[in-house]
From Swiss-Prot:
UniProt-recorded name of the protein: Flotillin-like protein FloA
Subcellular compartments: Cell membrane; Membrane raft
GO CC list: membrane raft; plasma membrane
Assembly: Homooligomerizes.
HAMAP family (UniProt xref): FloA
UniProt cross-references to Pfam families, sorted A to Z: FloA
Coarse class of the protein's main subcellular location: membrane
Protein species of origin: Staphylococcus aureus (strain NCTC 8325 / PS 47)
Length: 329
């Protein structure tokens, strides 16, 4: 009986220990105690009940304590529950402390929740980043296209990381400044001879306003001559004028052809009327003879006149052809 009771008690103890170990990461608790971070077992159990991974909170807390940061479990757990990256925020705070940058935990957490890489921002504040633009084309006043590539050295502005514009805005603004500077040059050789004028002009415009960066310098890395845009435009305009002139000439030719066809149709119409009128002449002559308006003698005289006229016309026609065929002396 005694042995049975002992076995039951032992089983209960083992089950209790298993339940305890499933809720309380004893190894993590011991590590925290060894690091001088006092975390109660009840706190760890509460994290389990709130579906918070204790390791993702306690491990960064140990790291912060070793770095001398006064952070609490509640701060880290709140940031974890908000969907933030606790480990990265703590690393950013440690890096900021080492670089003597004022970065409270609340600001770092806000930057992280805003979707920014807060650790990279701190590192960029210490080691500025170089952004290289693609070739940006501008046209000088003499019509020559000039392409320039710039290297922009920027430093993260932690105070404007939340709500500030990103790298794309910096590149777009610098590109706009390069195009404006090239376009205001009277000759493309001015750009080639003094590329630093682009840097000075662009840098003086305060292009980092409203962005998450501070522009330290803008250096022109390369300048190339592309093509003569002015000449190309003039060529295209001349070609367009030529096409317009050809189209108008074709229109006039079509109108002339249409007019010619219309005149031919009218000639045929008039010829048909003449034939119709000639066909009525015999009827009119017969009616005149019948009514006595013309005598038979007059009729034959008219026929003789027509025959004489036809003969003269034939003779004249043959004479003209002979003159045309005779060789020149």
């Amino acid at each position: 009986m005694f042995s049975l009771s002992f076995i039951v008690i032992a089983v209960i103890i083992v089950v209790a220990l298993l339940i305890l170990f499933s809720f309380v990461p004893i190894g993590l608790w011991i590590s925290a105690l060894a690091a001088g971070v006092h975390v109660g077992i009840g706190t760890l159990v509460g994290m389990r009940l709130r579906r918070v991974s204790p390791r993702k909170v306690i491990a960064p807390l140990i790291k912060a304590h070793k770095a001398g940061l006064a952070l609490t479990t509640n701060q880290l757990e709140s940031h974890y529950l908000a969907g933030g990256n606790v480990d990265r925020v703590v690393d950013a705070n440690i890096a900021a402390q080492r670089a003597d940058i004022d970065l409270p935990f609340e600001r770092a957490a806000a930057i992280d929740l805003a979707g920014r890489d807060v650790l990279e921002a701190v590192q960029m504040s210490v080691n500025p980043k170089v952004i290289e633009t693609p070739f940006i084309a501008g046209v000088a006043m003499n019509g020559i296209e000039v392409k320039a590539k710039a290297r922009i050295t920027v430093r993260a502005n932690i105070a404007r990381l939340v709500g500030g514009a990103g790298e794309e805005t910096i590149i777009a603004r610098v590109g706009e400044g390069i195009v404006s500077t090239i376009g205001s040059s009277k000759h493309h050789t001015e750009v080639l001879e003094n590329p630093d004028n682009i840097s000075k002009t662009v840098l003086s415009k305060g292009l980092d306003s409203g962005t998450a960066f501070e522009i330290l310098s803008i250096d022109i890395a390369d300048v190339d001559i592309s093509k003569n845009i002015g000449a190309d435009l003039q060529t295209e305009q001349a070609l367009a004028d030529k096409n317009i002139a050809q189209a108008k000439a074709e229109e006039r030719r079509a109108m002339a052809v249409a007019t010619e066809q219309e005149m031919k149709a009218r000639v045929q119409e008039m010829h048909a009327k003449v034939v119709e009128a000639e066909s009525e002449v015999p009827l009119a002559m017969a009616e005149a003879l019948r009514s006595g308006n013309i005598s038979v003698k007059d009729y034959y005289n008219l026929k003789n006149i027509e025959a004489d006229t036809g003969m003269r016309n034939a003779i004249n026609k043959r004479t003209d052809q002979s003159d045309d065929e005779s060789p020149e002396h």
